[in-house]
Amino acid sequence: MTQSDHTPPLLLPPRWETARLVIEDGRSPDVSSLHAIFSACAYVAPWDDTFREVPLADLAALVNRSQTAVGEDYRFKLQCVREKATGEIVGYFHISHGAPEPHTVWVSILVFHPDFQKQQYGRETIDGLCDQLLALGYEAIWLKVYLKNWPALRFWIGNGFTTILKYEGDKTMTPTSYAAIRLERKLR
């Protein structure tokens, strides 16, 4: 099953599960937990501008945007990753369905609190996400990784994002230069 280019993209369900995790749409009461998770990952900012300091209001706006059912924002979804055993939010991601192409999904961020990294929650989330998106008829997931963010490169490549679609960035290397690659994982 594939989607017609003229049909709106199908969206992830508001709640789904993996063996150890519950993934569900972010809600306003989750914002302070999401902000704490993001802030705990600020150590990555020197390698990846995505992790620069973000005000709490910006995360609240992303949660609100994720709850929109009209306009182009309906394609955007922020979901919290919770441990089944405790119910604690350990990470989150946001994606855009049908972007940048109709049969793809763009992952704009996937982040786990450092206390919950190296427990295979990221792999479990990505494997579950791939299963969900494949069932909805998507063909691929795209994302961007900063080349200075070696832990992220290892994570994404180790999780099947091995096709380089595009290089972005400066042509010469300096301490402040920017470079990133767009990666793809086929779902079929």
Regions found by a protein language model. Name each.
Residues 142-146, 157, 162-180:
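Conserved catalytic-core motifs of GNAT/GCN5-like acyltransferases
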Residues 3-21, 25-117, 126-128, 132, ...:
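Acetyl-CoA-dependent GNAT
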Residues 102-104, 140, 180:
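A generic structural signal for beta-strand entry/edge sites
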Residues 106, 137-139, 160:
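Short loop/turn motifs at secondary-structure junctions
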